[in-house]
Amino acid sequence: MGWTKRQLVDDAFGTIGLSGYVFNLSPDQQQAALRQLDAMMATWEARGLRIGYLMPSSPSESDLDQDSGIPNQCAEAVYSNLGLRLGSSIGKVPSQDLKVIAHQAYQSILTKYGVSMP
């Protein structure tokens, strides 16, 4: 099994300094982050970037403990970009390092999957 959706969410919070093991993230916070993950992955897919993410049929069907379906080499792009989204939704300014890592990782998977963006 690869990355679970919970692992992606936890690592995304970690990128913005809110690791669950330190900050005791509530189930509501984790579910909200999962919805953002699902929405981000739906957007990526709509742009032609299909990396195998297991999309739920509806937001209420999404499960944190489900395998994400993504290959290991895509995990950093997913959790770092999710970290950017989570940070902006809670008013936390992401570090410049996170912005660079998220951008570079995203560009790497665009190249790997042969997707060109305008």
Model-derived features with residue positions:
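Aromatic-residue-lined binding/catalytic grooves and analogous aromatic/hydrophobic interfacial grooves
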Residues: 105
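Elongated alpha-helical scaffolds
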Residues: 72-86
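Conserved short "hinge" loops at termini or chain/domain junctions
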Residues: 1-72, 89-101, 109-117
